[in-house]
């Protein structure tokens, strides 16, 4: 969110493979069209990826291809600036309101995910814990074990994007500070989810 992050490609471009796509770069969840940028020095890897891809993927659907043309041919700096400002504000809101002596969580510096750790001795696995959270709060989290963490580590992946991004964007400009009132107005489900998670964790 600080816009000062340097990619490893700035230091070692000849050995850096960049992968990205519409769903992450544009915040267009489910619009799966991705690509690799591979330096000439790694042509052998590029050739192997081409072989694997040709045997693995079918063609991208036509609507996504047309969306990609628009996404990549126009200047979207205003859209990106607004997106970053919204995600930064909402992410920091979730961090500030969820952290406690029972929830360890790092402040987000980019993206739209958090990985809180819920300190408790009630559950044996993070999967069991996430099922309990879903059943008792209606909040859906993915267990840390899905991302390679030990099952007994009570981690969960949380996405803070359950809001209408277009409506949010239409009601702010690049200079407007996004405060708690705006988050309550345009991201009410996120606010509700945080409150439910906080109450759940406090009653463990």
Q: How does the language model describe each region?
A:
Residues 22-23, 102-103, 144-148:
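Short, solvent-exposed loop/turn elements at beta->coil junctions and helix N-caps
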Residues 132-141, 147-204:
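PLP-dependent enzyme catalytic core of the Aspartate aminotransferase-like
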Residues 16, 103, 139:
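Short, conserved active-site loop motifs that form the nucleotide-linked donor/cofactor pocket
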Residues 122-128, 166-169:
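Short, conserved charged micro-motifs
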Residues 69, 85-95, 105-118, 152-154:
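Conserved glycine-rich beta-strand-loop-beta hairpin in the small C-terminal domain of fold type I
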Residues 9-85, 95-98, 176-180, 194-195:
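Conserved core segment of the aminotransferase class I/II
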Residues 1-7:
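Conserved PLP phosphate-binding loop immediately N-terminal to the Schiff-base lysine helix
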